[in-house]
Structures are given as structure tokens and as C-alpha cells.
Regions:
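Walker A/P-loop
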Residues: 89
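Conserved inter-motif catalytic segment of the P-loop NTP-binding fold
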Residues: 75, 83-86, 94-95, 99-186
Length: 187
């Protein structure tokens, strides 16, 4: 699946081998207008919007805190990117392990088994009894964990393998990644 028209397949280099796949209109939760109720929120001036100026959850990583402007802002969504093997999963596990000492944290792994995540945590000498983990690729199942556990911090590793049952496309496709990201941010 491609975000725009492609004449040549980027994987095999062949021309005119791609076929069009249409996603049914209205099947996406992101097609709703407004908020959850479908009602437009009233306009406000920036000065009237309440802010949590000083509330940030500092992580164990000084560099990550610096990049995030002082730490994690409650309610924010952060997308971490990088090349395979760059250490994204390791960094996320270190961060969530540090935060779990004082916040409820849930780590969802979609690419690795629970044994692999636990082995990495032990190798890094991270506290293994403070982070709740689940191996899952269904967004709807993740929402069930979220509703039951009510975490302060949710880590999804990785969004690329997550899928929503609301769409009939493959996990990792452009429409799936957009849908999953949009629904996670809305929540």
C-alpha cells in the first residue's frame, strides 16, 4: 500500500505490478467530525486555554528529557523513529522501567516475545517487577488492557505491527498505521 500513486514497485523494481486497493469510506474512526460526540468544540483564545506549564514527568534519560523539553508531558503522544537496530526498543524499555517506579506503566510489544523483552530488561539490570507487559498486535485488545489497567504511561512497540479490526487492510499498511496512530492519540 502506498500513500500516493506508484508506477514502479519499490521492492522489486517492476513496473505496473501494483494494484489499487480502496478502503471503504466511513469505516475509519477518524472520519468522524468533531470530537467523540460529533459536536464542534467552542472557539477559545490561547490565553483562555488551561495549561500544565510545570508538569512534566522526568525520565531516567537526561538526553531524552532535554529533547522533550524537560520530560514527558502528561497526555502527550510521542512517536519515536529510527533505523532498525538503533536502540528504540531498548531506550523505551529503560524509560518505562524508570517511570514505573512512580507511575503506572504498560508496555505493549508487538514485534518481540515477552521472553525477549524480559531478557533485555534483565541484561540491562532494569527493575523487572514494576512494568506490566503484554504481547499484542490488535489495537482493540490494547484498548481493553488500557481500560482494565488504566496506565499513566502506555508504550506501543511498534506501531508498525499494530492493526485495527475496523480496517480490512494489512498491518503495517499506510491506512492501518494512520488509523492506529489516530485512535491512540484520540484516546
Amino acid at each position: 500500500e502506498h500513500a500516493k500513486w506508484q508506477g514502479q514497485c519499490q521492492s522489486c523494481g517492476e513496473w505496473n505490478t501494483l494494484s489499487q486497493l480502496s478502503v471503504a469510506a466511513g469505516s475509519s474512526a477518524t472520519t468522524q467530525r468533531g470530537g467523540y460526540s460529533g459536536q464542534l468544540a467552542p472557539l477559545q483564545t490561547l490565553g483562555s486555554v488551561p495549561t500544565m506549564d510545570n508538569e512534566r514527568w522526568r525520565t531516567e534519560s537526561g538526553e531524552l528529557n532535554r529533547v522533550l523539553g524537560g520530560g514527558l508531558v502528561p497526555g502527550s503522544a510521542i512517536l519515536m523513529g529510527g533505523a532498525p537496530g538503533a536502540g528504540k526498543s531498548t531506550l523505551l524499555l529503560q524509560v518505562v522501567s524508570g517511570l514505573a517506579e512512580r507511575k503506572r506503566c504498560l508496555y505493549i510489544t508487538g514485534e518481540e516475545s515477552l521472553a525477549q523483552v524480559a531478557l533485555r530488561a534483565k541484561r540491562l539490570k532494569l527493575p523487572v517487577d514494576v512494568v506490566s507487559v503484554a504481547a499484542q498486535t490488535s489495537l482493540e485488545a490494547v484498548f481493553e488492557y488500557w481500560d482494565d489497567y488504566k496506565p499513566d504511561v502506555l508504550v506501543v512497540d511498534s506501531i508498525q505491527v499494530m492493526h485495527s479490526e475496523a480496517l480490512e487492510t494489512l498491518p503495517g499498511s499506510v491506512s492501518q498505521v494512520r488509523e492506529v496512530a489516530a485512535r491512540l492519540v484520540q484516546r
